[in-house]
Amino acid sequence: MEKSPEHCAEGSPSPATESAPSATEPPLPSTEPPLPSTEPPLPSTEPPLPPLPPDFEKYWKSVQAYPEDFNTWTYLLQYVEQENHLFAARKAFDAFLAHYPYCYGYWKKYADLEKKNNNILEADEVYRRGIQAITLSVDLWMHYLNFLKETLDPADPETSLTLRGTFEHAVVSAGLDFRSDKLWEMYINWETEQGNLSGVTSIYSRLLGIPTQFYSLHFQRFKEHIQGHLPREFLTSEKFIELRKELASMTLHGGTNDDIPSGLEEIKDPAKRTTEVENMRHRIIEVHQEIFNLNEHEVSKIWNFEEEIKRPYFHVKPLEKAQLNNWKEYLEFELENGSNERIVILFERCVIACACYEEFWIKYAKYMENHSVEGVRHVYNRACHVHLAKKPMVHLLWAAFEEQQGNLEEARRILKNIETAIEGLAMVRLRRVNLERRHGNVKEAEHLLEEAMNKTKTSSESSFYAIKLARHLFKVQANVVKARKVLSNAIQKDKENTKLYLNLLEMEYNCDIKQNEENILAAFDKAIKSPMSIAMRVKFSQRKVEFLEDFGSDVNKLLDTYNEHQKLLKHQDIVKRKAENGLEQPEAKRLHAEEVSTAASVPVTTASMDATQSGYNYGSWYQYNYPANWNFGQYYNTPST
């Protein structure tokens, strides 16, 4: 169960022990151009803003600089509470709760500050915002109900209607939570205080069919409620008449012909009246016993899952692996066995406790795709705008969903937002490129790739985007000249990047070989004369010999290339012998180091993106299977030296 109002800040240090440099908050830019004024402006009637507490700015600057550091927020909030400065408190709490809306205890703190300053309407608004942000918080609903009890006028006839409506809203919103027992009990106790015993019966009838932690206790108290009052008191008139008719029909079926009133009339015979009361009580308990038995069976199915949930509330600290696994297994169980209502409630509970984990939000959105388009958007919106603002995969999936729905502008906006939040994210830039390509905007796709290529900070990143751009120009726009230029320029900047040469060759091979022989040979020569390792240049040389053997038009070129290849092989042997004698680093070891360096420099993003990179493994596009060294001596005589 949600612990205490401070549960989001366990172990938070006092602001007195921390400090941060001071600064002022920059003004927000205007989004509308000012209209021309034809009259002199009227003097402002709004009172000037009160000065902020002396140390407010240093704490404010700290949270602006590190919005994801929970402790910096707690320093700020503790400070404004100590100062009891309402304007500063509003600014701090509004900003904090925009980042951490699931910290239900801070909604109460905020409302208490408003109430302390006699701002009852403002406090009510804070509570309403809170329960809208975390609808399943049983504790927050109960705090709000207690607030209403304290602040509403008991003499006003509307008060009881307001409270009853709020209780109903609370149990509809949070009453299916397994740990919602105390909210139901609060509702029952309040209706009992109002003397509305039929209302109490109605609440119990609903509660006994809901799997909750103290389901058995509720049934026991329900039986006490039935045994402690007369049916006329705890049943509505309609229910009383309906039950009386049911019992009368059962009596007539049994052969008894006693006169039993069909309406609300009292039975005059005391003995018969007592018998009817007992029969009614017995029948009501009997009906609810069946409901209880079914509910007990449902509770038994989920009891072990519920017992394993140790932290049902939100916290910034990571959950233990066992807790995460329990949520996964519980969700799978409900997806196979539960109703839509129960599944949605469990997902909502899960994304409170596991708010910082992408996989649960994604699973929730995927489930909602079969039920409600707006429901999917609501899930993605909460995940991407509040809890997972810098997690790319959930943004990518949201953008893909909107693209499926035909909302291209929304998909563009989502991708642009995450790219702004995390600069240099290759997977997002490529998703933006391919979104435009899929919908025929090939020039915009080209522009996005060029922009990414020119903004990179390293030559390897620039080469990565150059390869992408060249493939786009060649395969999508059929512009081989422009694609060749892109790769050639990239080679000039990153002369040891094997992938550039391989992609240039691949492109030239895919053109008409007869008409493109000179360009293919030029591409081979670029690689062979490059500063790449001798082993890699030998491989390109082997490929050149093979090309001329299979497709070449001039035997003289073939013989010349073969001779050059033999010289390169001899040079490779010399390098190898030097390495064996300890004069140079072994070629194989150096090659391995270069491969590791190249792999490490591929532009991805942050350390947290490891799990998402497997889907963007471009290495397979650049692989070639080179044969072993060919013995061309069987065809050509080795030239004399």
Curated annotation (Swiss-Prot):
Tell me which Gene Ontology terms the entry assigns under biological process: mRNA 5'-splice site recognition
Q: Does the keyword Signal apply?
A: no
UniProt biased composition (Low complexity): 10-23
UniProt keyword annotations, A-Z: mRNA processing, mRNA splicing, Nucleus, Repeat
Segments for region (Disordered): 1-50
HAT repeats mapped onto the chain: 50-82, 84-116, 118-150, 158-193, 304-336, 338-370, 372-407
Q: Where is the composition biased (Pro residues)?
A: 24-50
Alphabetical list of SMART domains matching this protein:
HAT
Q: What InterPro entries does the entry give?
A: HAT, TPR-like_helical_dom_sf
Q: Which SUPFAM superfamilies match?
A: TPR-like
Q: Where in the cell is it found?
A: Nucleus
- Indicate the family of this protein: Belongs to the PRP39 family.
Listed name of the protein: Pre-mRNA-processing factor 39
Q: Which organism is it from?
A: Xenopus laevis
Q: What is the lineage of its organism?
A: Eukaryota, Metazoa, Chordata, Craniata, Vertebrata
The gene name on file is prpf39
